[in-house]
Amino acid sequence: MKHGWLNIDKPYGVSSGSVVGKLKKMLQCKVGHAGTLDPLATGVLPIAFGEATKTTNYATDTLKSYEVTIQWGEQRDTDDKEGKIIRTSTLRPTEHSIKEALQQYVGVIQQIPSTFSAIKVGGMRAYSLSRMGKEVALAPRSVCITEIELLSVDSGSNTADLRITCGKGVYVRAVARDLGITLGCYGYVARLRRTMVGPFTEANIVTLQELETLVGENKLEEAVFPLSIVMSGLPHIEIDVETAKVVKNGRNIRLVDAALNGLYIVENCDMCYLSQAGGVPVAICEVVDGTAKPVRVFNV
């Protein structure tokens, strides 16, 4: 099986890039991921391989969910437990005060990413500059948090567990930092696990060890999701074999003439996903006045 998606349970202490590197060796093909996880984070890391690497942005743009433990009383330069302590407080938030403060973080908010992030500043990663001791000034960004739920509060360990569901570009470490400042007690991420990226959840996750076993037993298909799993946000149009050949040669087609399933009227949408009958991927196309122009062709 040369194309598709895997839902990897990224282990603690391993970078997303390292996971990609291991899978390249294991699968012997092109591999990419949809959404970086910090080394200290665990959980859902969608991996595309083969022609599915052309669809990673569609997974990156989906909703994501995280479960995070915030440690109160300290602010750290990395906004997580691996950083240096830069401020402390003896104040501790109550469950009521946390719930009230969380309301400020739901919806479209302005967020300044962590200075220990992968954002590029003058051609260098922010975390590289920060580790060199250089001051990093990042501009606020508009991001969307759809839901924050307080799961538990532990007064003994001075921690709180939250579930955060959000869109693209949200830094959970920055949420912990800002929430601690709002509450006047400071805070940082002590534990972080991603539980969902669009269609990929903990219910359909696989560890690297489990995947290695499946590959060794020639059972990789048991863990593979089709390339089209991240295409649910686009209108899906089936075309015949001859029309598919035309599209794969880079030529435009009139959807009213080519569609097999009658979905050739694409309203309020400028993109569509084409496949042959049976689900064989053909292309992602730009739609203009009923004409589909291929922008990503799948060689499967």
Curated annotation (Swiss-Prot):
A molecular function GO annotation: tRNA pseudouridine(55) synthase activity
Catalytic activity: uridine(55) in tRNA = pseudouridine(55) in tRNA
SUPFAM superfamilies listed in its UniProt record: Pseudouridine synthase
Biological processes, Gene Ontology terms: mRNA pseudouridine synthesis; tRNA pseudouridine synthesis
Summary of the function given for this chain in its UniProt record: Responsible for synthesis of pseudouridine from uracil-55 in the psi GC loop of transfer RNAs.
Entry-linked InterPro entries: PsdUridine_synth_cat_dom_sf, PsdUridine_synth_N, tRNA_psdUridine_synth_TruB, TruB_C
Gene3D superfamilies cross-referenced by the UniProt entry: Pseudouridine synthase
Similarity annotation: Belongs to the pseudouridine synthase TruB family. Type 1 subfamily.
Name under which the protein is recorded: tRNA pseudouridine synthase B
UniProtKB keywords: Isomerase, tRNA processing
Active-site residues (renumbered): 38 (nucleophile)
Source organism superkingdom: Bacteria
The species this protein was found in: Anaplasma phagocytophilum (strain HZ)
EC number: 5.4.99.25
Pfam family, one: TruB_N
